[in-house]
């Protein structure tokens, strides 16, 4: 097991760095990583105190610092200590600068105009949790996306994933014996997307769900003919209302969410073109 001290320095919250580091570390096995977060680094005095800590725990230094004096001092000291230092955003900023023909704005934490995006994401997560499984139908019009389908068609995990991307998502189950309220069919603002799957896959998922709850897997809930009828019922509703449909049988949650985001973008592009 390799032990690595990872120092993450940012002139803002450090969230961007944390995500970059997490993505990079996921490519390596057998590494015990000790992360040291140093956010809001906006003065040389603050940096000097951090450098003393880094010298005590040498390792890789990754940073997002737009103040040239501070970053130059950091790079110089890391070089003197024999430590690698990496500016996480430089390749992206350089490429954008060349493409756009503009110099980057050296403003600390500018990615957190992003602050607005961050709070919007938090709000989206709160909304999505509060509107799971057909709850709070009076607020569905506020959603960006409404996912619908039969039980265990991956509505909830897909909703949560989309919420983490900043979308307010409600999900509405389609049950033959208990249809959604009439207001569901007259929603205007949200994009309604139907999720479907194969009967075989759905039976397997439902059976595993019952077993995890220590319940008998021999019920109508997992009867193949009953499940196939439920899926046909849902598909008729999707077709009658012209809603886009995504088959999740062989898709991961991430792939399903990506397909839904594409639908959202296509819809927005059409509306802008009007």
Curated annotation (Swiss-Prot):
InterPro entries with a match to the protein in the record: Kinase-pyrophosphorylase, PPDK_reg
Binding residues for ADP: 149-156
Residues forming coiled coils: none
Catalytic activity annotation: N(tele)-phospho-L-histidyl/L-threonyl-[pyruvate, phosphate dikinase] + ADP = N(tele)-phospho-L-histidyl/O-phospho-L-threonyl-[pyruvate, phosphate dikinase] + AMP + H(+); N(tele)-phospho-L-histidyl/O-phospho-L-threonyl-[pyruvate, phosphate dikinase] + phosphate + H(+) = N(tele)-phospho-L-histidyl/L-threonyl-[pyruvate, phosphate dikinase] + diphosphate
Keywords noted in UniProt: Kinase, Nucleotide-binding, Serine/threonine-protein kinase, Transferase
GO molecular function, one term: ADP binding
Statement: the UniProt record of this protein carries the keyword Kinase: yes
The enzyme's E.C. designation: 2.7.11.32, 2.7.4.27
Pfam families for this protein: Kinase-PPPase
Function: Bifunctional serine/threonine kinase and phosphorylase involved in the regulation of the pyruvate, phosphate dikinase (PPDK) by catalyzing its phosphorylation/dephosphorylation.
Entry similarity comment: Belongs to the pyruvate, phosphate/water dikinase regulatory protein family. PDRP subfamily.
Protein name per its UniProtKB record: Putative pyruvate, phosphate dikinase regulatory protein
Source organism per UniProt: Rhizorhabdus wittichii (strain DSM 6014 / CCUG 31198 / JCM 15750 / NBRC 105917 / EY 4224 / RW1)
């Amino acid at each position: 097991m390799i032990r690595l001290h990872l120092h993450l320095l940012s002139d803002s919250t450090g969230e961007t760095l944390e995500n970059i580091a997490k993505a990079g570390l996921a490519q390596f096995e057998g590494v015990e990583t000790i992360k040291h977060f140093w956010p809001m680094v906006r003065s040389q005095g603050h940096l000097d105190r951090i450098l003393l800590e880094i010298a005590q725990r040498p390792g890789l230094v990754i940073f997002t610092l737009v103040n040239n004096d501070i970053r130059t001092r950091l790079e110089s000291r890391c070089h003197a200590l024999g430590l690698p230092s990496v500016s996480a955003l430089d390749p992206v900023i350089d490429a954008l600068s060349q493409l756009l023909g503009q110099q980057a704005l050296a403003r600390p934490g500018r990615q957190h105009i992003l602050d607005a995006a961050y709070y919007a994401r938090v709000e989206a997560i709160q909304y999505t949790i509060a509107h799971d499984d057909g709850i709070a139908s009076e607020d569905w019009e506020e959603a960006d996306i409404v996912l619908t389908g039969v039980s265990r068609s991956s509505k909830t995990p897909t909703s949560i994933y989309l919420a983490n991307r900043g979308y307010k998502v409600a999900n509405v189950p389609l049950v033959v014996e208990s249809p959604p309220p009439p207001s569901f069919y007259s929603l205007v603002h949200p994009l309604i997307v139907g999720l479907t799957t194969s009967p075989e896959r759905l039976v397997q998922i439902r059976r595993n769900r019952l077993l995890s709850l220590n319940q008998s897997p021999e019920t109508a809930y997992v009867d193949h003919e009953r499940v196939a009828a439920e899926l046909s019922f849902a598909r008729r509703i999707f077709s009658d209302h012209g809603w886009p449909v995504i088959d999740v049988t062989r898709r991961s949650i991430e792939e399903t969410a990506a397909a839904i985001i594409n639908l959202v973008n296509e819809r927005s592009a059409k509306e802008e073109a009007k």
